[in-house]
Amino acid sequence: MVVLAAAIVVKSGKVIVSRHYVDMSRIRIEGLLAAFPKLVGMGKQHTYIETENVRYVYQPIEALFLLLVTTKQSNILEDLATLTLLSKLVPEYSMSLDEEGISRASFELIFAFDEVISLGHKESVTVAQVKQYCEMESHEEKLHKLVMQSKINDTKDVMKRKANEIDKSKIEKNKPGGFSSMGSMGSGRLESGFNELSISSGGGGGYGSGSGFGMISDVDPINTKPKDRSRSSVTAPPKSSGMKLGKSGKNQLMESLKAEGEDVIEDVKPTGQSKAAAPPPTDPFTLTVEEKLNVALRRDGGLSSFDMQGTLSLQILNQEDGFVQVQIATGENPEILFKTHPNINRDMFNNENILGLKRPDQPFPTGQGGDGVGLLRWRMQRADESMVPLTINCWPSVSGNETYVSLEYEASSMFDLTNVIISVPLPALREAPSVRQCDGEWRYDPRNSVLEWSILLIDNSNRSGSMEFVVPPVDSSVFFPISVQFAATSTYSGLKVTGMIPLRGGGGATPRFVQRTQLIAQNYQVI
């Protein structure tokens, strides 16, 4: 068996991919392949055609021909086995069996052909082995990546411990002095009980007994940066008139990153007018009602999954104000299941809708970071699409050398959505897509190849909208999954704080408090 060449040609005779395995000139290969389409129409066989010098063994693949050019002395049965193996490999490396798809995967196909045929002879391999050889996976490379990831995780743990130590030192500094030892011990014991039963807002949900419920905050150790030593107040050296190579090089780097679509935050010296960090709470009590949505919509319509998790947290400014109870009102939604913190009096909540500690002589802990102490949480899971606040429809269609994509959104009347961002993944493009129509604003991220559709506010004036853009021809699966971000000031539960009940002092007056309510899309996709 001697295979002279393996090729993929169109029925008109145009060669897309060709690989020859013997010493043969390009003119001869092109002549043999150019003569093949004329012989197909004349011959009566459907698997091979013989000429005076060579034999063509071929197989149709939609509008193409997979072709082996062999000598006449070659074993026809082995040639057919080789052709069958190659026909199984072609769909593995080409998404579409047309001229453009084969051209895009031409190098991968040549590498796969080389694994099957060596010096004109068939190798004893399978499709799985060929894919493994072409992937060229390295055990040492995987081990190196695991070691690097382990180092990164260790560094994050160290940064997290440092951040916790800094937070604890700040709390210790802010604690007022003069308390008796018994009072300090009691407060510390209760505060530790809340901390030990804290819940992470990014976890995998569920009301199992293993998850606690306390301080609701995610401390990102990466954002806790030490003070830049280069900005300390030292005597500035005298200015020189020499060339400032470092400055110009830095500016060029910044400009190049901006040209590639990267968001660059320039390192500037702080001034008195620069934006400061978020101010600390000034009100005695701050209550936060937050609901997070995790929704997966099907691209052909319907709901795949719906999960809403809500929390109510309390942040107290002063230690002496911790002897309080919280009066709430819940909406009439029987599908929402409420669960209190273990230190909260469950019977009082069920009978009077009041959140108070089991031990009224102990205050709520103060000095908690983030949103404060978690008091209540709830959850709702539905399979009804009518509860979804926003649905997205994506309609891609290929016409000639272009793919027309039509996007539509429909918003429910239950919520007014703000800061809506619909992110559509795109194939790798040399330039931004051609946007024909857009209700709102759009932005193309070339680094991540994502088209972002932004709507500042969705209310009764624009419950529906559309966007149309054009890209080169691609498979429709490229545009999924579509990610959606938004926020709202109303919630599914309708939970509201109606008042604060002081247990000590206050003269019966209702303490002043601030309530913050928000609904956010944590993981909202069209798959």
UniProtKB/Swiss-Prot annotation:
Its main location: cytoplasm. GO terms for biological process: protein transport; retrograde vesicle-mediated transport, Golgi to endoplasmic reticulum. Residues 166-187, 217-250 are annotated as: Disordered. InterPro entries: AP2_Mu_C_sf, Coatomer_dsu, Longin-like_dom_sf, MHD. Gene3D superfamilies: 3.30.450.60, Mu homology domain, subdomain B (2.60.40.1170). It is a peripheral membrane protein. It holds the Pfam family Adap_comp_sub. Residues 166-175 have a biased composition (Basic and acidic residues). Residues 282-527 form the MHD domain. GO terms for cellular component: COPI vesicle coat; Golgi membrane; plasma membrane; plasmodesma. PANTHER family: COATOMER SUBUNIT DELTA. Oligomeric complex that consists of at least the alpha, beta, beta', gamma, delta, epsilon and zeta subunits. This is Coatomer subunit delta. It comes from Arabidopsis thaliana (Mouse-ear cress).
